[in-house]
Amino acid sequence: MLLFLVFILVVSQVVLLLLSPQFRDKFIFRWYYDEVYKPMILDNSRYRIKFYVVPVFYLSVYSYMVYIFYSRTFAIISPMLTSIETYVVIPLMLILPLFFGSMSMIIKPDSSNAHQIGSEKRYPYDNLLYFPQHECRTCKQVKPARSKHCTVCNSCIYLADHHCVWINNCVGMGNYMYFYSFLCSNLLLLSYSFIRLIFIQFNKSAYNTTPTGEKSLLILSILCGSFTVILAVYCYFVFELVNSGMTTNEKDKWQMVHDYINTGDLVRDPEGKYFIKYQNGGNNYEFYSTDSYDGTQYTIVDYFTVKSPAEITNIYDKGNFINNLREFIG
């Protein structure tokens, strides 16, 4: 009964939190929006303990699954495990996600607040996604190529990918290796556990168990299988970006460029500079730089319409997955 009441309380708070922006003109929602939603969600400077909710959730689920394994299933399946699995493989695979997860949280990426000498000049400006001599509107420092300001970390992150809520840290120059290792170690543990548990359950004659033990095996198998699929899909998208030589932040920028190409609005002048073409009645066009900081209207007479992404070179792509991976973790 107590758990049910707690569940109802949590669900009601989540519903109020999600609906308060849309119905903030209503009394109860207005109060919730002003006193809870704004300080908890919109204001990153207040209640910063909120950023640890997701890491604690991950650790709770992880601990629960380990508890089920050792308290309810290990004794059942141990006769079918080899000594290497029992004393080396399983303990090691249980430790690695915690180790790499901790390192991903602790190791901060290079940023405008703290970075190695020269790291801010590591990448050239491509004059399509990134432009020189731009000052970050928030931290008031020159923005290096491939950087992005993070409102949670309150700094410009070099080689910025994204702010990961699972580790409460930005993924960027200096901690890609730990983040990728965190993903892979979790995927390895989950997939191994799922496959091993399924194999064991198909050989029920080799062990004796109670209905409770059978239920625990089933719960653990479902959890491992579900998380394996989710994490495998996510890892695929992460490493597909690596293969393309781009970050998550750059993927969104490239998507915008591709949208302009599809509509025939991205053009290039004889000097190789890119502009966005806007129709201004009839055959009249206005031209603006792809630089969001530059609001100047340009007059261009001679230009070439970019018709395919293949006509644009991603100067940050090193040609293959291995070289790009070295670039990220190097």
Curated annotation (Swiss-Prot):
Transmembrane segments: 1-21, 51-71, 87-107, 182-202, 219-239
Gene: SWF1
EC number(s) per entry: 2.3.1.225
Keyword match S-adenosyl-L-methionine: no
Protein localization: Endoplasmic reticulum membrane
Residue spans, topological domain Lumenal: 72-86, 203-218
Domain comment, as recorded: The DHHC domain is required for palmitoyltransferase activity.
Molecular-function annotations in GO: protein-cysteine S-palmitoyltransferase activity
Keywords (A to Z) from UniProt: Acyltransferase, Endoplasmic reticulum, Lipoprotein, Membrane, Palmitate, Transferase, Transmembrane, Transmembrane helix
Coiled coil: none
Catalytic function, reaction form: L-cysteinyl-[protein] + hexadecanoyl-CoA = S-hexadecanoyl-L-cysteinyl-[protein] + CoA
Main location: endoplasmic reticulum
Keyword Glycosyltransferase listed: no
Protein function: Palmitoyltransferase that targets several endosomal SNAREs. Palmitoylates the SNAREs at cysteine residues close to the cytoplasmic end of their transmembrane domain. May have a role in the cellular quality control of transmembrane domain-containing proteins.
GO cellular component terms, A-Z: actin cortical patch; actin filament bundle; endoplasmic reticulum membrane; Golgi apparatus
Membrane topology according to the record: Multi-pass membrane protein
UniProt similarity note: Belongs to the DHHC palmitoyltransferase family. SWF1 subfamily.
DHHC domain location: 134-184
One Pfam family hit: DHHC
Protein name: Palmitoyltransferase SWF1
One GO biological process term: protein targeting to membrane
Enzyme class: transferase
Topological domain spans for side Cytoplasmic: 22-50, 108-181, 240-330
